[in-house]
Amino acid sequence: MLRWIDQGTARGPTRPAGRAGDRSVQFNTAQRELTLKIVYYGPGLSGKTTNLRALYQRILPQLRGHLMTLDTADDRTLFFDTLPLVFTAGTLKVKLKLYTVPGQVMHNATRRIVLQGADAIAFIADSQPSKRQENYKYWLNMVENLKANGLDVDSMPNVVQWNKKDLGDASTQEAIEKMRKENRQPVYEAVAVRGEGVVETFLGLVDLTFTQIDKTYLLSQKIGLDRRAFVEEVRRCLVDPPVPGPDGKAA
């Protein structure tokens, strides 16, 4: 269980690990197809959609589907965003379906629905000191909604990304370092609007996710696809970011 650092002291709730519910991971042995659902969760305006947009820019055009978004006038996600990625790893056809959830309090029912069948979660926290309590609140909300879907945060791959790192302060860095020492979840720092830390967060979660499903489907034994090879295939789906010109814009 993640020991969430709320203003440097508070921790996440302690509760017995629940059963893992039905996830959406689909492995078609006959056609050798694997489908995974990854959800980006977190407070409103923490950078969930920004992460997906940054990934969209990095994925090879021939491998990515359409990035579907439905935003309100103030650039908040109204329902959810989805970004499909389809590629081949060894002899396996892989479909990664990336989702975000709306952050506004009023859309909790939608967040619960989007979490149905999730295989992995990236929790996007806001590094601004004023958002510390809100981060904690939404972590608890995520745990509750997972439980409502028969899922348990302790038994599924998940990472934490502290986004807007450029807007944090010394207390934020202290909280991040403390979280890294006390929790099993990998913790990443990012400035998603500049694309920094986005790919690292994504690949880190992909790594954890494959490790989890390999225990169930024994992919490394059955088709000779191990964790390193899988992550490397995902990495090959990405292109390098454009190099900034003298004016700071992409050349």
Model-derived features: positions:
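C-terminal-of-GTPase-core extension/linker across diverse P-loop GTPases
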Residues: 196, 207-251
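Canonical P-loop GTPase G-domain recognition
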Residues: 166-218
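Inter-motif core of Ras-like GTPase G domains
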Residues: 108-129
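Switch I (G2) and immediately adjacent beta-strands of P-loop GTPase domains
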Residues: 68-106
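Conserved C-terminal guanine-recognition region of P-loop GTPase G domains, centered on the G4
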Residues: 127-183
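Conserved beta-strand segments of the P-loop GTPase G domain that flank and frequently precede/overlap
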Residues: 97-100, 122-126, 160-163, 189
